[in-house]
Amino acid sequence: MSHTAKMASTFNNFYEISNVEVGQHFYWQLGSFQVHAQVLITSWIVIAILLSLAVLATRNLQTIPMGGQNFVEYVLEFIRDLTRTQIGEEEYRPWVPFIGTMFLFIFVSNWSGALFPWRVFELPNGELAAPTNDINTTVALALLTSVAYFYAGLHKKGLSYFGKYIQPTPVLLPINILEDFTKPLSLSFRLFGNILADELVVAVLISLVPLVVPIPMMFLGLFTSAIQALIFATLAAAYIGESMEGHH
C-alpha cells in the first residue's frame, strides 16, 4: 500500500470515529432544505405543554385566584419582578412577555430532559432529547437575545445608539462590536453544555447502577436545569437593560 493510500485510510478512520462521536440526526427534507426534525419535534411538544398549562390555568379566572390560577399569577409575578430588576422600572413592561417566554421555554425544556425518557421513542436515525440539549436551539435563543438587545437600544436611542461602540476610544470599536455578539453566545454554550452534561451523567449512572444512585443525580439535574433557565433569562434581561442605558 502506498504512502498516499495509507494517509487516505487514516483520514477515513478519523472521519468514521467523528461520525460515531457526533451521532446521527433525523432530518425532514423540505424542498432543497434539510430540517433538523429531532429538535422541532421536542420543541413543539414543549410549546404544546406550555400552551395547555396556560389554557387550563386561565379558562375560569376568578377575582380571588385559587389553584392553577394562583400558581400562574405567582409565576408571572416572579417573571415581572425579574424583568423589572434587570431592565428598570420605566422600561421593563414591554419586555415581560419576551423574558417570560424565554424563561418558561428553557425551564420546561430542561425539565423535560431530566424527567421525560425521550430516548424510548425510536426514530429512523438518531434519538430524541430535550430541545436545549441541542446546540441549534441554544444558539437560536442567543440570536433572539441579540436581536432584542439591538432593537431595544435602537428603539430607545435611535442612531446615537451606535456611538457607544467608539467609547471611550474608537480603537475599541472591533472589541465593542465583538462583545455584543459573544455575550449572548456565551449564554447559549453554557446552557447547552450544562444540559448535555446532566443528561449524559444520568444516562451513564443508570446504565451502571440502574436503581438507587441515579435518583439523587436526577434531583440535582432538576435543580441545575431551573438555575440555568433563571441565569439565561436574567442575563438576557440585563443585556437588554444595558443596551437602553448605554453603559457597560
UniProtKB/Swiss-Prot annotation:
Chief localization: plastid
InterPro entries assigned to the protein according to its UniProt record, in alphabetical order: ATP_syn_F0_a_bact/chloroplast, ATP_synth_F0_asu, ATP_synth_F0_asu_AS, F0_ATP_A_sf
PROSITE patterns per UniProt: ATPASE_A
Subcellular location: Plastid, Chloroplast thylakoid membrane
Annotated GO CC locations: chloroplast thylakoid membrane; plasma membrane; proton-transporting ATP synthase complex
Membrane-protein topology: Multi-pass membrane protein
Chain segments annotated as transmembrane: 37-57, 96-116, 135-155, 200-220, 221-241
GO MF terms, alphabetically ordered: proton-transporting ATP synthase activity, rotational mechanism
This protein's UniProt keywords: ATP synthesis, CF(0), Chloroplast, Hydrogen ion transport, Ion transport, Membrane, Plastid, Thylakoid, Transmembrane, Transmembrane helix, Transport
Organism superkingdom: Eukaryota
Job description of the protein: Key component of the proton channel; it plays a direct role in the translocation of protons across the membrane.
Family, per entry: Belongs to the ATPase A chain family.
Record note on quaternary structure: F-type ATPases have 2 components, CF(1) - the catalytic core - and CF(0) - the membrane proton channel. CF(1) has five subunits: alpha(3), beta(3), gamma(1), delta(1), epsilon(1). CF(0) has four main subunits: a, b, b' and c.
HAMAP family: ATP_synth_a_bact
Protein name per Swiss-Prot or TrEMBL: ATP synthase subunit a, chloroplastic
Source species: Marchantia polymorpha
Organism phylogeny: Eukaryota, Viridiplantae, Streptophyta, Embryophyta, Marchantiophyta
